[in-house]
Amino acid sequence: MPRASRDGVSIYYEHDDGDDTPVVFVQGVGYGRWMWRWQREAVAGDYEVIAPDNRGTGRSDAGLPPLLPRLPQKLRTPVMFKLAGYSIEGLAADLEAVLEDVGVRNVHLVGASMGGMIAQQYAIDYRRAKTLTLVCTSHGGPDAAPVPEETREHIFDVPKGANKRERMRHRMRPAFTERFTNRNPHLMDRIIEWRLEQDATPAAREAQAAAVLGFDVSEEIRSLRVPTLIIHGTDDRVIPAVNARLLAETILETRLELIEGSSHCVFIEDADRVNEALGSFLDEHE
């Protein structure tokens, strides 16, 4: 099993051979490698693929002090998480450790939600990004549209007595349209199982969420000179689609693909359209 190491924390990644420049897939808060299965299948063979588990997710180490997960939530602070490597800068440094371990020079970097934030930070701090694909994400900062209050309330208003699967299903609802979940009950059940197998521990998920809250590259990305594809669902109830337009206005060389009526998990809900846009963009810059 390939692993990289940074500051004593082991970062797991998968590496599939291909003919062209590696495509690197970076996940959102708490999500495991499963979330990119549709896109990985679409580029497999033509492109080399690298898929790391973010710190605290899947087979990667959490790197959290042993006592921290046992502390009452109100005593856990963003500073504690940051010292344990949970800032967007720290997660981008983990990604650099992976790419250094693989030994690649240039990559097509694809990130969704928090993964899109890591991708932006990586492109600013390091020099391997040949292109960026930013899905359902934001540049952060005071101008970015935050998670809607209605979504926040839903995520934290978990029904009493719900078991682990029921809690996960409840919290996941805002990430999909009701139309999609009603039409795909078996897939939603499978996603729950994938999440139980690969997702972050509760403490690591909290640490990743704290990293997102501290993210702001709204000024730095103005000087970014990397071809960028921006994909966003117009009905995203987690990171509103206005953030895609802000990114397109701020990054110099961009292509904006708004997918009408799609959700935060647009890469699942409208995988074919995302794959078509991604494949065309990668081929253009290969």
Q: What residues fall within each predicted segment?
A:
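Flexible "cap/lid" loop of the alpha/beta hydrolase fold
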Residues: 120, 124-125, 132-161
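Conserved alpha/beta-hydrolase catalytic His-Asp/Glu region
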Residues: 143-144, 165-213, 220
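Active-site loop/oxyanion-hole signature of alpha/beta-hydrolase fold enzymes
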Residues: 51, 55-110
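Short beta-strand/loop motif that positions the catalytic acidic residue
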Residues: 224, 230-232, 236
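Catalytic active-site module of serine/aspartate enzymes centered on a nucleophile-bearing elbow/loop
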Residues: 254-286
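Conserved alpha/beta-hydrolase "acid-adjacent" motif
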Residues: 237-243
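Gly/Ala-rich beta-loop-alpha elbow adjacent to hydrolase catalytic centers
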Residues: 111, 115, 119
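Conserved HGGG/HGGXW glycine-rich cap/lid loop of the alpha/beta-hydrolase fold
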Residues: 5-76
